[in-house]
Regions:
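Eukaryote-specific intrinsically disordered, low-complexity regulatory regions enriched
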Residues: 1-160
Length: 160
């Protein structure tokens, strides 16, 4: 099976959840020949991210994080490129046609990549992208749940 077929299988719109076996197969294929497969994978990633089907994009975002964390520094460099971050991820946050839940997931992925790539200063573009998300699109960053307010028990509550 070719790399493209594996990526299409891992991001199939019929999948309702991530299939980690398919995702790991893609990561293994990319790692088998990074010089040839990373540029090909990034080309396909860009095409899949531009799809209108939210299911495809959601599966691809998970695959993108997995590839960034498992396919080595060359893949990280490609993901951290300004062109990819700006054109494929940040542009979707400003697009009114993109569903709100998808925007939450894109912001979450940028945050996750920022945490994963923090140790490498050459990947600073991801930190810059995350800073831009925090500044321009804070509504898409999930805040921790607020603590419920404490209320004093009434006499009636104590009787029950």
């Amino acid at each position: 099976m070719t790399l493209e077929e594996q990526i299409l299988k891992a991001t199939d719109p019929a999948l309702t959840t991530e299939n980690w076996q398919f995702i790991l197969d893609v990561c293994d294929e990319i790692s088998a020949d990074p010089e040839r497969n990373i540029p090909a994978a990034m080309r396909i990633f860009k095409q899949r991210l531009a799809q209108k089907d939210a299911n495809i994009v959601l599966r691809l975002l998970t695959l993108l994080v997995a590839a960034g964390e498992n396919c080595g520094s060359r893949m990280q460099q490609e993901i951290a490129s300004l062109a990819f971050l700006k054109d494929s991820l940040l542009a979707r946050l400003g697009d009114r046609k993109v569903h709100k839940e998808l925007k939450f997931r894109i912001a979450e992925v940028i945050e996750q990549l920022d945490k994963s790539f923090k140790k490498d200063p050459s990947l600073k573009a991801v930190a810059d992208a995350y800073a831009k998300v925090r500044l321009k699109y804070p509504q898409y960053l999930k805040l921790p749940p607020s603590k419920p307010a404490k209320t004093e028990m009434t006499v009636q509550d104590r009787k029950n």
